[in-house]
Swiss-Prot record:
NCBIfam families: ureG. Facilitates the functional incorporation of the urease nickel metallocenter. This process requires GTP hydrolysis, probably effectuated by UreG. Belongs to the SIMIBI class G3E GTPase family. UreG subfamily. GO terms for cellular component: cytoplasm. Homodimer. UreD, UreF and UreG form a complex that acts as a GTP-hydrolysis-dependent molecular chaperone, activating the urease apoprotein by helping to assemble the nickel containing metallocenter of UreC. The UreE protein probably delivers the nickel. One of its GO terms (molecular function) is GTP binding. GO terms for biological process: urea catabolic process. Keywords: Chaperone, Cytoplasm, GTP-binding, Nickel insertion, Nucleotide-binding. This is Urease accessory protein UreG. It is found in: Cytoplasm. It comes from Blochmanniella pennsylvanica (strain BPEN).
């Protein structure tokens, strides 16, 4: 849910199931936006800082702008019921870089019911992937129906898993009821600009 009062930096939660492409999305977004905006990232993993390492190795941003949080428990608890570890990571980044425009907060892989605390994020992006099957949009859940922007990733795999993009398009429009979403292929960049454009529009709106 969009906040009425803009907090600088804009905090964007990125959620979705394991393997849907959250980290890959952040890599692409950071590389596309970092020349024009001051960015930072907080990643969440249960027992490791693997997603932090992936983003650093990919040169998504400089290493000091990417903070890894080991939640040690259920992924949605760390972004919803007790977001204290993530809030601390956000505050540390703000203290270190006083000119940040956007902080992305990537949740650990979770189910379709995961949501971010409004204390933690101003906008929520949710990532699912075609490889999970064309039934996923109609399963619903807050990530599908209420996220500010839904990304349906890995469209290049549709033919290999027997998923119909036409069915996913129909069901997503029904479930989203006018809220924005996009198909993406993060390997080719297909659909990424629509995500960037949405972020920038909301940033202006919330100022």
């Amino acid at each position: 849910m969009l906040l009425n009062q803009y907090r600088k930096p804009l905090r964007i939660g990125v959620g979705g199931p394991v393997g849907s492409g959250k980290t890959a999305l952040l890599e692409v977004l950071c590389k596309r936006m970092k020349d024009s905006y001051q960015l930072a990232v907080v990643t969440n993993d249960i027992y490791t800082k693997e997603d932090q390492r992936i983003l650093i190795d990919a040169n998504a941003l400089s290493a000091d702008r990417i903070v890894g949080v080991e939640t040690g428990g259920c992924p949605h608890t760390a972004i919803r019921e007790d977001a204290s570890m993530n809030l601390l990571a956000v505050e540390e980044l703000i203290s270190k870089f006083n000119n940040l425009d956007i902080i992305f907060i990537e949740s650990g892989g979770d189910n379709l019911s995961a949501t971010f605390s409004p204390e933690l994020s101003d906008l929520n992006l949710y990532v699912i992937d075609v490889a999970a099957g064309d039934k996923i949009p109609r399963k619903g859940g807050p990530g599908i129906t209420r996220s500010d922007f839904l990304i349906i990733n890995k469209i290049d795999l549709a033919e290999y898993v027997g998923a119909s993009l036409e069915i996913m398009n129909r069901d997503t429009n029904l479930m989203r009821k006018g809220l924005p979403w996009s198909f993406t292929n993060l390997k080719t960049g297909h659909g990424v600009q629509s995500v960037v454009d949405f972020i920038l529009r909301q940033r202006l709106y919330l100022q």
